[in-house]
Amino acid sequence: DAAVSVKDDVVEFVNEELPAAKADHDNAIGIYNAYFAGSSDQDLDAFKTSLQDTAIPAMENCITTISNIEVATDEVKALKDSYLQSVQKECEAMKMVVSAIDGENADYLTQADSLIAEAATLRSDYQTKLQAIANEQGIVVNQ
């Protein structure tokens, strides 16, 4: 096998591999955020059900999809790792919220908030790494 260039690897990862995972992710995050945006008239039990039946399985599917993506370069492996860790944190946060609703333990909500913040930091790290690779390789990234 000829060595895969960083440019080809990043383009394949972002344009071809990631979109399938991103669809699950966006769906799950939409469910999660809708409740907190106050635009939802769901009660907590309905929210818990949508997390358990739809959002968490979608996140787990997203995690599996990303985990199974094969990358050829260290640069893109670092990108994949940041993205994967951010999704894992978000999934953990959703599970914490379900536990908080079940046990009505407010500490779980605080922990979920922390996980979401960590996920945002990791996602930002991913964006920064992606932009650096794009600049280096002369690729235009549509975020």
Residue ranges and their predicted role:
Residues 2-54, 88, 92-143:
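C-terminal amphipathic alpha-helix
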Residues 56-84, 133-141:
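Short, solvent-exposed, charged loop/turn and helix-capping segments
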